[in-house]
């Protein structure tokens, strides 16, 4: 597991180059609310956010929310904030992730799909500033237990879930990358359960899994949390199965996105990601 420890440079661009820059822009526009008192990730975060949608708020009254003092039901305290609603709580927030007006969204998507821009590779990426491997993943309170993963639907979900993910896999036959948005349930300090069969024919990651299963090999996967909105937006988009979402993200931004090599699996990942969880998905089922 690796993560970035940097702060936003505040660099101005048409589309935010990373998640920190996006949050800074939202805050400057009054679209991000910071909650600094203790908030329980298991029982309070998502009910507070959902209240904006079911409690009578108009869309232009909704805000993204950053919880900076996160605790768990077992007495856990976390030094990582949780951000909710910062990608698509409103049309305006979504459009700000692309650096365009709401009226330009459809045009920008069509341009990006028709004219993708290939990513560029970089070394010494921000996402590798902090790397956690080996025994540090399985010790008490280590690994995934360091992350304040919330319960999305208290009373219904069987586990805390990462939701706004970018799950990176690669076709073992063609080498084509896929980036999908799949919920990842926390099972242990070093284990997540990821559901990739999210469409009738199988999502891109699931089709890759089927190929690895035929090869009798586990599937390398990198789960990205917190990166440039244009990268996240490609995950749930229904693109051609052999189209590289990272290139489409470049088309959305109007410039190449930065990628780097993962530390433990043969995949390229967003270089400016906040958190990357690397691992293998078992195919011996």
Describe every region a protein language model picked out:
Residues 2-285:
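Extended, highly charged
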